[in-house]
């Protein structure tokens, strides 16, 4: 424990906050082949693997996920929200931050209705979150 004099001389260092979605904090310069510090709200990527995984206890389901290689060459696991999807390997997807509490290691969501990802069919409520168009009357 520091003395009062030590605290007067040095002071306390505040801890820097850690990002919950670190892959969105980097860009990539393909000419120089270096990472850049350009952060982005979403990033484009290519699905390298699409599958299902089981959640932590006490939940039980088959949650859909995709392994995505981003445009900054970082590979992340992203959750596919909604019922049913059309993603395959090599689909181009848009990811955003946001973890899935019962899937360890999944810190990103795929944006439905953007790029190759179709919106959820027949969805009437919370349509904007799932890329569903307004139904015709």
UniProtKB/Swiss-Prot annotation:
How it assembles, according to the record, is: Part of the 30S ribosomal subunit. Contacts proteins S8 and S17. May interact with IF1 in the 30S initiation complex.
State whether keyword tRNA-binding applies: yes
Q: What is this protein called?
A: Small ribosomal subunit protein uS12
Q: Which ranges are annotated Polar residues under compositional bias? A: 32-41
Read off the NCBIfam families from this record: rpsL_bact
For this chain, the family text in UniProt reads: Belongs to the universal ribosomal protein uS12 family.
Q: Which GO terms describe its molecular function?
A: rRNA binding; structural constituent of ribosome; tRNA binding
Q: Which Gene3D superfamilies match?
A: Nucleic acid-binding proteins
Q: Does the keyword Ribonucleoprotein apply?
A: yes
Gene behind this protein: rpsL
Q: Which GO terms describe its biological process?
A: translation
Q: Where is this region: Disordered?
A: 1-57
